[in-house]
Amino acid sequence: MKKIIFLISIFFTLIGSTSIANEVNIFSARHYDSDVQLYEKFTAKTGIKVNVVSGKDKALQKRIIEEGKDSKADLYITADAGRLGAFQEKGMFQKTSSKALKAAIPSNFRSPYWFGIAKRARVIYYNPSRTNPPSNLSYEDLAEPKYKGKVVIRKSNNVYNQSLVASLIANNGKKKTAKWAEGLVSNMARKPKGNDRAQILAVAAGEAEYAVANTYYIALMLSGKKGPEQQAAAKKIKPFFPNQDGRGTHMNISGGGILKYAPNKANAIKLLEFLLTKEAQEHIVNNTFEYPMIEGIKPNKLIAQFGLGFKQDLKTKVSKYGKNQASALKIMTEAGWE
């Protein structure tokens, strides 16, 4: 009798373990409600429950590191390859192999440890009623003396700027990038302040001729989700895609990686693969105004109206953003970039 009870106990323990394992735990620094809707679609298709812990990057990373082997986190998702790369440098991701992910994602938008889910471009904004930028305008040009007092951009502690500078280091070297940063600082129309939308608003208000900001922000403003004033301001502004005569416009990603101690690795891989399907990509671009990672998907019309044929920088591996992040911040700080 005792033997039977023991076997039954093992049976239910195994059943319970299987039930618990049919889930995936995401730690996400992305702030979109639409992501949760996407995870619900994944659950409906696979039966795998998705548990989400949302927060800011620093807090999430601190928790994952402190919990160590006891962490229940399977998948870490965030915006910006620089953040993913920096976390990778701390040894918090594990190598992941997936034929589906490798086939779907261009090699420069992934690493052996993490994968791009969607793309964004960091571009130059201008008011066409006041400014006519040259057709060959580049990021490098913004440091030239003729642009003195004409440029607005966020602070140096912004990771999007750090990744932009990291890409310049990758392409031009530290010495040239340091000189560029000094020139850019001297050309700033004001001390850096505010978010990306604040830079676009400054150009709309005539405070500067050029603003550096990510592409999805103009679409967000045009959508009316940030109010009628920002919508009206955005209608005055256009994005310019720099470096079309060279390597192409600076691209970055939203992405995710499977964590070192992930208890549900197989489910985490399934979720990543789902995020790169046609259904998921269409959902992402139509809700976040990002560019799709896979071919054959059209971005939201609010971003597509500005053109889809621009040359993207497909040469620079986004994994270099994390590797060059410390050097980028040092260069920015030494240049007096607040």
Task: Mark where each language-model region is.
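Ligand-binding pocket segment of bilobal, Venus flytrap-like solute-binding proteins
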Residues: S167, N172-P242
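A structural signal for short loop-to-beta-strand junctions that line the ligand-binding cleft
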Residues: S71-Y76, Q94-I124, P128, E140, ...
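A bilobed periplasmic-binding-protein/Venus flytrap-type ligand-binding module shared by bacterial periplasmic
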Residues: V123-R130, A166, N243, M251-N264, ...
